[in-house]
C-alpha cells in the first residue's frame, strides 16, 4: 500500500519493482529504518510461481533481487531482514510443498537466515517447510503469522488456538503471530482470546479500516493511535510488533516513540517489522 501511495501505481505485481525500480524499493526500506524499524521484510510477499504463472526464472530473479535490496538497506542500521513469503495456494498439496521449498532454498542461497510466513489461513505446507529450513540451516529463525477475523477464525475456518498449537508442537517454528485483516483493537482482542502463547508472539495489524477511493485502497488511522495502541499490547506479553497494510513510516515512528515512552518489550523481543 505504501509503494502504491508513493508511486501512484496499481494493478501490477509490486514484487516486480525489485527488478524494474530497485532504487525505489530500497528508498522505501530506508524510510522505515530511519523511522526506527529494527527489522524489515523483503518485497516478495506474492513472489511465487502460482501468482507469476509458473515463471520460475522470473520468481527467482524477484526473490534474489528483493533479498539484495533489503540487505543493502538494512546494513547501515544493523537491522534484521526477514525473507517474506506469503501463502502459496491454488496448487495440489505436493506442488505447494515443492513451491515453498523452491522459495526458501532460493532465499537460503542468497543468505537469508530469518523467515516470515505471513497472512496464512491454515498450516498447509508450513511445518514441513520450516523443518526443511532447520535441516539446511539450524540457526535460522522462522516466524509464522496467521490472519484471523475478530472471532478468532481464519478464512479457511480454523481457530487460531488450534493453528498455533500445531506449529508450536512441531518444534520447527521459533515465533508465531497475527497480521493483516484487523486493526489494533481487534488484534488486541485476539491476543486475549488466545490466552497464554507457547511461543514468542508477533502482532502486525493493519493501520486501520480500509476505504476505497478511485479504485485504490487506503487505510484511515492516525499514527499516534496506532503506535499507542500497539505499545499497550506489548505489556500483555507480545514480543514482536509492527504493521501490515496501510502502515507508513509515520506509523512505525509513532510506535517506536510510544514504546520508548512506556511500552516495554517483553524478554526476547527483537523487531518492529514493516510492510
Language-model-detected regions and their locations in the chain:
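Domain-level signal for soluble alpha/beta catalytic cores
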Residues: 1-275
Amino acid at each position: 500500500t505504501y509503494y502504491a501511495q508513493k508511486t501512484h501505481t496499481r494493478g501490477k505485481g509490486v514484487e516486480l519493482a525489485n527488478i524494474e525500480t530497485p532504487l525505489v524499493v530500497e528508498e522505501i526500506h530506508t524510510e522505515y529504518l530511519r523511522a526506527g524499524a529494527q527489522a524489515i521484510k523483503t518485497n516478495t510477499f506474492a513472489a511465487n510461481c502460482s501468482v507469476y504463472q509458473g515463471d520460475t526464472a522470473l520468481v527467482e530473479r524477484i526473490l534474489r533481487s528483493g533479498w539484495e535490496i533489503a540487505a543493502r538497506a538494512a546494513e547501515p542500521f544493523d537491522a534484521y531482514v526477514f525473507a517474506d513469503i506469503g501463502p502459496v495456494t491454488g496448487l495440489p498439496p505436493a506442488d505447494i510443498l515443492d513451491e515453498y521449498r523452491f522459495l526458501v532454498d532460493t532465499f537460503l542461497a542468497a543468505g537469508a537466515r530469518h523467515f516470515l510466513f505471513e497472512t496464512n489461513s491454515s498450516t498447509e505446507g508450513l511445518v514441513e517447510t520450516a523443518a526443511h529450513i532447520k535441516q539446511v540451516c539450524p540457526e535460522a529463525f522462522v516466524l509464522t503469522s496467521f490472519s484471523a477475523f475478530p472471532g478468532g477464525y481464519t478464512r479457511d475456518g480454523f481457530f487460531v488456538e488450534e493453528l498455533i498449537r500445531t506449529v508450536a508442537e512441531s518444534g520447527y517454528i521459533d515465533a508465531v503471530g497475527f497480521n493483516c485483516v484487523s486493526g489494533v483493537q481487534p488484534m488486541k482482542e485476539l491476543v486475549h482470546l488466545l490466552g497464554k502463547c507457547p511461543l514468542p508472539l508477533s502482532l502486525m495489524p493493519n493501520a486501520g479500516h480500509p476505504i476505497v477511493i478511485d479504485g485504490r485502497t487506503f487505510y484511515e488511522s492516525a499514527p499516534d493511535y496506532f503506535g499507542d495502541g500497539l505499545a499497550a499490547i506489548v505489556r500483555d506479553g507480545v514480543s514482536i510488533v509492527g504493521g501490515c497494510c496501510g502502515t507508513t513510516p509515520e506509523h512505525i515512528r509513532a510506535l517506536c516513540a510510544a514504546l520508548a515512552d512506556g511500552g516495554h518489550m517483553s524478554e526476547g523481543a527483537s523487531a518492529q517489522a514493516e510492510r
